[in-house]
Amino acid sequence: AFTYPGFKYISSFGKRGEGPEEMISAENIRWGGDNTAWVLDGSKNRLFRYGGIAPGQEPKLEENISLDKAFMRPLDFDLSGADSFVIPDYSGENRFSWADMSGNLLHKSDCIPITDEKQLKESAPAVAQGWRSFISFSPDKKLLVTVTQLGDVLDIYNMENGRHINYKGEDGEPEFHVTSEGYGIPAGRMCYYDVQVTEHYIYAIYDGRKFSDIMKEKEYKQGAKQLRVFDFDGKLRKEYMLDRPVTGIYVDEAGHCLWATDVNTDNQIVKYIFD
């Protein structure tokens, strides 16, 4: 952990595992406020909460939460408030699953907005895999935004009035094949890598390369170069082309800068200034 924006080292947290039961494979990390961080391990179906992440404090594991079995290997999550969180529903029955802070399923909501409703009905788990999404809440928790990893689709869900806005770009919905075992196998493009909702806009990093073209590349670099900026009505307002592919983003609107992770180099944190 580091201070921001000075990036002064504070401390490290998370015990180094000495066996399979002690290893944490982090799918995502969310800052929970009050010097705490939440870590999702999808392979174990668990959430870990670390406290004391601040100068002068000693970080420690405070909660080890086993998620309800209804969560089928969660790959992303976000805190929806002080008493609950949301995870994409990988069963295909709905779009989201909501849980309390003990990992118990509260309810499910919304549906995957696929055009082929017949395919959803017949192969729901495969569709959920093909529509794997990254999610982000707005700071006030009023908007929940999703972007699809395998398609050019962005959805905005208003938590107050139930309004749903669906944006489909030129590259269309996720393309995938359904195997005889019922799995969804990618067949089209690599699209969104990350999304962040701020007080004013939605920022998402987008690739768009076909898998067939990626396979031909001699030196494949993971990530995307295109930064898209949407308003809260789902309208694309700006596009920036970065000088390298990145996988994760953090936008500091007040500081007019973008922080991104470049996993293809040893210097993995890069900074961009924008208007």
Language-model features: locations:
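Short loop/turn segments that connect beta-strands within beta-propeller blades
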Residues: 4-6, 51-55, 100-104, 158-162, ...
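Blade-loop segments of beta-propeller domains
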Residues: 8-38, 42, 65, 243-247
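Structural signature of eukaryotic scaffold interfaces centered on beta-propeller domains
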Residues: 27-32, 75-81, 127-140, 187-198, ...
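Asp-box/WD-like beta-propeller blade repeats and closely related beta-sheet repeat scaffolds
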Residues: 43-88
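Beta-propeller blade signature
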Residues: 98-101, 218-234
